């Protein structure tokens, strides 16, 4: 081999691989879930789900056998096989990691490791053409291929202790990004100038450059800074804040507007630590804000506290939405909560993990609680023609209630640069 796996390290030579025990537990959970749903096996090839199951994001597929099946779980890799072996634990890999067969031989390869039925696929996530291609290669197997997307999403809602540690570290770095903006932002600075300052902190800490989302065709700017009127400009993105963005091909978030005196600047930052999302929002200004703006901020903090309390008690996410949106209505914010008509968003929080837009969501229709181990960013905001104000932190639900994984009270809701 012409290269050395010793180069596959994090900062200061740290081993950033997912622990093998994590991979074993995840595969075991999926294996049980497949059998509970009458599925012999599942063929997984989406990059995020592959990472969750294999610890890497190489070009390949993994076949997970159901607990009650005779299928040998196998990770097939097209490129790079040696890297995939290392990232899955090297000699301690939970299951075989071997070269991917020709797709024309996929059905026979499945038979060789104990499969007889068409495996389930991520029909609800992968591109339709990819699904059609895989389906054409497994048509000689018996039965009908089922969609295992909801099974995978459901399993990933409940984070392990290791994953929660990753989110907590993500939150720590997120706070450092805010501290850099506190230090170097201010009057006359452009939104993009300040975003670059935060980006620098994130990159030095190991951010890989991608924010992954489920909902097509969503992509996002992870350092959204909107000064004054910029916050009222809508975008394609399903969020309270739009923003001008850098150009028409990037019409979201930080743009070329400059900070003005006594006007709210909303800073909404996403950081990923080893893939895991933390999401926070705080308000800045160059000079004092009016009493009206500060009252609005206090109200958003009250709404966030009520939503967190509801989730902590085990209320359905739809109930938490009802509580928060009713409070906003009583406070007089119906026309401004999470945007202005006709560009409003209708949620108060979203689950996070390896993706920014995981489930459940604080919105109508999510008639189930956030599970123990579930992680969620809760972000009440109000938008007006002259600006936005609100707050956001990322939480995990534990047996004892909701725990903040990000800045919480350690960084003020409002910072005056002057």
Predicted regions and their residues:
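Active-site neighborhoods and metal-handling regions in enzymes and metal-associated proteins
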Residues: 1-418
